[in-house]
Amino acid sequence: SLTIAALALGIGPGDEVIVPNYTMVATPNSVRLLGAKVKFVDICPKTLWIDFQKAKKSITKDTKAIFLVSANGRYPSENIDKFIDYCISKNIKVIEDAAQSLGSYYQDNVHIGLKGNIGSFSFSAPKIISTGQGGALVTNDDELAFKISRIKDFGRSGGGNDTHDYFGINSK
């Protein structure tokens, strides 16, 4: 689901994506698979979240997105809303990798995974809900949701037809 999220946000060659240095390999691989550059940033040892100040200092003109990873339902001690506002001001997309945080909340009672442009949840074997190798993406951006639905179904234009006018993969 992380690769689909990155595809939906238009990440590709020449782009740079900031990723915390404490995450599962699927996070940086989803960026590398699309030909973008991964820039690892240190985490805060107390929360295991990316260090927001170090992430801000790592942003360059090529930075297109940042992955926020919540390990085991932990949340940042810093204000995530201010950090996301900062990303928006720099036109940087935010993907929340909430694979291990289904059902967890931020301090303001918003579910982890619902504050960025896209939230990603995993349903693989060791997770809270397991479907084998499934997952889910969430967004409250209708245009982005439509892109995601097309990408995960071979680029099909919708409605079960055989019109494939958009790049996509088999990830139903």
Regions from the PLM with identified roles:
Residues 1, 17-18, 123, 135:
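Hydrophobic alpha-helical segments that mediate membrane insertion or helix-helix packing
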Residues 2-6:
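Short, conserved alpha-helix that lines the donor NDP-sugar binding/gating region
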